[in-house]
């Protein structure tokens, strides 16, 4: 996982100066493309199955070579204003491939279109969905790309 993490980190550091002066729409489109690229890099290693919720979108990203039980709940970064299901699936594909475990990603509702606590409610709904599916807290973890730190 170290190589993939370095690759992702270098990509994000490279794009950060460009994104700083972009409109919200351009930033969102750029993140979508980054997610599509990352998913494509792992397409031979993972299966992706979308799972819609009433207020947001989610997806299962499952490694073809599953080596562990349990699940990772992945919540994308983006400062609560950016990030989509495509973006989340890209990072989830890397996690699933490298860790050999299922990843469920939730593309929570974004600001400014949706006010607080919409994103928090969506994250909680995704977590409760996993609990209902039988994933006990001790057999799951949450990976968050620091939404507020972007």
Model-derived features: where do they sit?
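Serine-hydrolase catalytic-loop signature spanning alpha/beta hydrolases and amidase-signature enzymes
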Residues: 79-82, 87, 103, 129
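Short amphipathic alpha-helix adjacent to the substrate-entry channel of hydrolases
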Residues: 86-106
């Amino acid at each position: 996982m170290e190589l993939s993490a370095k690759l992702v980190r270098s990509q994000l550091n490279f794009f950060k100066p460009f994104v700083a002066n972009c409109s919200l729409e351009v930033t969102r489109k750029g993140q979508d493309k980054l997610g599509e690229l990352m998913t494509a890099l792992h397409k031979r290693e993972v299966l992706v199955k979308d799972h819609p919720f009433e207020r947001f979108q989610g997806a299962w990203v499952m490694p073809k070579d599953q080596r562990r039980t349990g699940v990772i709940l992945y919540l994308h970064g983006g400062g609560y204003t950016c990030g989509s299901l495509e973006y989340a699936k890209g990072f989830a594909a890397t996690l699933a491939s490298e860790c050999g475990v299922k990843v469920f990603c939730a593309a929570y509702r974004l600001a400014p279109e949706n006010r607080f606590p919409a994103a928090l409610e969506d994250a909680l709904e995704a977590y409760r969905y996993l609990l209902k599916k039988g994933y006990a807290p001790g057999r799951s973890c949450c990976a968050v790309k620091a939404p507020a730190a972007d």
